Amino acid sequence: MSDIHRDLEFLHASFQPVAETWLHICKDDLGIEMRVLETLRDEDRQVELKRAGKSQVKLGWHNVGLALDFACFDEKGVYDTDNHSGLYTKCGLVAEAMGGVWGGRWRMRDYGHWEWHEGFTLQQFLDGGKKGVV
């Protein structure tokens, strides 16, 4: 079993301040009870998740520190797994306003996920083709 990284310090240096601001807005300004579940993933963890059917990719934005997963809790402190409270939508809209991609918009919804890569592909990132980020 691989380690699960939850701290924002494990995110890519370009994403850390964005994620910190997002977390502050969601928690402090909007009053949403939430926490970060996972930031950076190593390859072993990604393989585990793919085998378990919890990820569809061999390599993704988590593997380069440009994605995070989070959980929201309703007013009773109950973990909201399907956005019935609308809290994930609020957090997702904040992420999108900051230039992020929110998993709640995908065909296979991933409400508690967002990634920040400013319009470039993972391959461009891996190839070092994005100035100022890599």
Model-derived features with residue positions:
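Active-site acidic/histidine clusters and adjacent loop/turn architecture
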Residues: 1-35
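Acidic helix-start/capping segments at beta-turn-to-alpha-helix junctions
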Residues: 36-47
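A structural signal for short, well-ordered beta-strand segments and their strand-loop junctions
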Residues: 31-37, 101-105
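Catalytic cores and adjacent binding grooves of peptidoglycan-active enzymes
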Residues: 56-134
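Glycine-rich loop at the start of a catalytic domain that most often binds anionic cofactors/ligands
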Residues: 48-55
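Charged, low-complexity surface patches
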Residues: 15, 38, 83-84
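Residues at alpha-helix termini
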Residues: 29-30, 52, 98
